[in-house]
Every structure is written in structure tokens, then in C-alpha cells.
Amino acid sequence: MNKKIYLLPLLLLALIFVSCEETKEAGKYDNWKARGEMFIDSIAAEAAAQTEQTPIAERIYSVLDQVNRNYIYYKKNIDYPPTSNVSPLYTDSVVTNYRMSYFNGDIVQQTFTGKDPDGFSKPVGFTVDKVISGWTWALQQMKVGERWTLYIPWKSGYGSATGPSGDLQPYSTLVYDVQL
């Protein structure tokens, strides 16, 4: 009987230690690649579900990345209509304002702050064929003056790399706010 009295407190003590074990919280970038792919899949499903009655401001368009064989999705900002009927060619130089963010909304790079580009913006110039393939294929569809939101899968972005300056998460699905 005496042994049974000691067993109960020992059992309770063991349960307390087991129940106090810390659980690991999910990190901000856990399952990053899979989450990014699910985000693009949701954009693709939204694009596929569109009808002729879908308002122009809500339409999602797509262009095939001829290099990586996946689709780049984009929305046109109707508040920024084209100022010209000209679209850049593969070897053309362009000037853009842009904001690059992860699919979770974290801003990574930008040439403007605030909601819209303004006189304090610092647009950048580059050759269309010298940027990530997602940009290359989307830019060739844009007209001068337009502003689009691009949804770029990781394969058409920086892939498994961390970007030119090493500050990107590998396998990042990217969202760009671009004005040509």
C-alpha cells in the first residue's frame, strides 16, 4: 500500500513535465514553396472561373512563360489606361515603377512609397530580356502607361535562388505592382 501512495504523485509529476513541453510554432516561411504554389493555384482557379460578366476591373489574365512553361497571371489597373498603343519588344529598354512583394504581402523592393508612384518615385530602366522571365513575358503584353499587378510563380521568378542581392527567400512566389 505504501508503494501505491508514492506511485500516484510520481505519475502526476511525470504528466506535468510531459504536458509542459514546448510546441514549436510555425515560422513565417515554413512550407514557403508549397504555400506559394497554392497561392498561384488559387489565382489560376479564379481566372478559370471568370465569365463574360466578370467586371473588367476584376478580370485576371494570363500569359505563358515560354521559358519555364508556366503561366504568369495579371490584373490590369483600370485607373491607369495606356498612354500609347506601343508594347515593348523582347530586346527593348523600358522604364518602370514597381513594388515587389511576397504573396503574403511583405514588401521586398520598391521604386515608390505610398499607394501610387509620384514625383518622388525612382523609376528604373532595364532591357526586357535581362529581367526574370515572369517580367519578360508580362512586359511584352503591356502598353506604355498601363499599371498591372503581376502574380509570378517561383519558377518564373528567381527560382530556388535568393535573388541578385541575396535578400529573397528561395522558391518565392512574387507579386508585382508595375507601371510601364
Pin down the residues of each PLM region:
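Sec-dependent N-terminal signal peptides
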Residues: Y6-L12
